Amino acid sequence: MDSNFKWLLFAILISLTFSGFVLHHGVLAESVKPDEAKQLRDEVRGMFYHAFDGYMNNAFPLDELRPLSCQGEDTLGGYALTLIDSLDTLALLGDRERFTSSVEWIGKNLQFNINKTVSVFETTIRVLGGLLSAHLIASDYATGMRIPSYNNELLVLAENLARRMLPAFDTPTGIPFGSVNLMYGVDKHESKITSTAGGGTLSLEFGVLSRLTNDPVFEQVAKNAVRGLWARRSNLDLVGAHINVFTGEWTQKDAGIGTSIDSFYEYLLKAYILFGDEEYLYIFQEAYRSAMQYLHKDPWYVEVNMDSAAIVWPVFNSLQAFWPGLQVLAGDVDPAIRTHTAFFSVWKRYGFTPEGFNLATLSVQYGQKSYPLRPELIESTYWLYKATRDPRYLDAGRDFVASLQYGAKCPCGYCHITDVELHKQEDHMESFFLAETVKYLWLLFDLAVDSDNLVDNGPYKYIFSTEGHLLPITPQISLAREHCSYFGGYCPSNSTKLEQEVLGEDSSNDDHSNDYPYHESFPVTGLIKGLCPGLTHAQKYGFSYVLPEKTDREDVNQPKPVVTSSSIVLISDQTVEKRPQEEEGFTSQSEPIMTISGGSSNDQTGQELTLLESETDDQRSYSS
């Protein structure tokens, strides 16, 4: 069969996977219209407050809510985790009263001088990120949520917390330990094994903290960790899942875009966009190109050996679902659409995405049947709708809402699903449900009704952290100085005389030099005209950050990739009748299950497409 014809056929089949927006037993659902989008947005707002009020009334100040029993539990450090994680969602929803009262309570009551051993990764993305995002909102008139009485209390807490985590970075490789005691540092018996995501997903929060405090140490240690991981990449430019932070040896060489690695890729691109640091862009471009070359089995992604590219794990895991959203940010929208289509078909089959779905057996992976309210697929849906305005993503959003409302809602919040096939509930609600899951759902529908929210129509462009926290691209954070103390690093603002000359200020009238030891924002015009080169072209306008795929490796001595012969199975959700659509390009027909027979990872034109009749008549999905 002609290779061009095969790829055309493949593209047509993929475009049809989204055709199955079904209600009950094959009854077709109408596409979401503006009035319904507004109703869904309001419903999601109600979902947030059902869970937030449940936490505040039954669990606060413990870390997280047990929504079935209406009790609380300390799961991370015992410092009101869910409240901190929810702060910028409250601001996004325009809830000035609760945002203000929450910030004031945290500023007066929270402390980190506690004998608790915590995850460096989770504490950074949830607590440090939550504090920094809320600080940037509460201290800025332009956000519309400034708190008049606020005096940088959250920033003080953020710096205190980050300093308590610095001992974790004291390793020969620069890659941090996975855990640290907030009072005593790293325990002598602490494991030396950490995940790639755990060590390489700190640059946004630590970098922002350096910009706000004028102390480069936080940005330096986070960047050194990324360098330490990237320096140990394979000849194929792939990284493994787990590494020894002392020896630099990979203890798990499975490369992928999901569990244990996912946000490493995410923060490479986002750190460049936020800070304008081109070293991050270079690493991202090389890492992304290799991921697409060796991990991508269009539209799915597999795990391979980082040295040989041999497939070791033909499984879709739910953490991979962030990838289409990252691709949108990178300007690679077409493969993002195809992959999101495939991932969403798993949700349609079960009503949720299991932690693992085996692509060879077309079944939930053993031991990975749960859905812990993860946001990644919803996040990618938001980004794809923002990029395309295709109403199919609103339809997907409606399915998400229905699944959560009818399958996960509990007396005091929303429950984990322990088994996506039986829809069993578990008495736990992660803080990220309020930080991310409902946030992205609300943004999706708000965008459909000409939103006026902080993110889409606010004073700044925002980067979302991997925990969904809002980090603004502002001159204070994003502009690099012309003279830096280390390559690619933040240049501290220590030339007071130069700044005063440029800004026309008199140092003798500086009444604030001893009041507060943190960075005061300078006028934007002064920075751009006098001290800094200004926002980069990418920061201003955005463009594709993706490099073309390499056809020949630059080093001829590098080992050739060896790929095991195996079938990668592409599933659809359900066979449905033709769906009427007003929008151009929305067609529907019976959806086959598709398989790609294994071949060389570099010779996709040699792959065969096989079409099979769907044999699953009892696939479960929630629809409104």
Curated annotation (Swiss-Prot):
Pathway: Protein modification; protein glycosylation. Keywords: Endoplasmic reticulum, Glycoprotein, Hydrolase, Membrane, Metal-binding, Signal-anchor, Transmembrane, Transmembrane helix. Residues 29-624 are lumenal. One of its GO terms (cellular component) is endoplasmic reticulum. It is found in: Endoplasmic reticulum membrane. Residues 586-608 have a biased composition (Polar residues). Its EC number is 3.2.1.-. InterPro entries: 6hp_glycosidase-like_sf (IPR012341), EDEM1/2/3 (IPR044674), Glyco_hydro_47 (IPR001382), Seven-hairpin_glycosidases (IPR036026). One of its GO terms (biological process) is protein glycosylation. It is a single-pass type II membrane protein. Ca(2+) binds at T466. This is Alpha-mannosidase I MNS4. It comes from Arabidopsis thaliana (Mouse-ear cress). The lineage of its organism: Eukaryota, Viridiplantae, Streptophyta, Embryophyta, Tracheophyta.
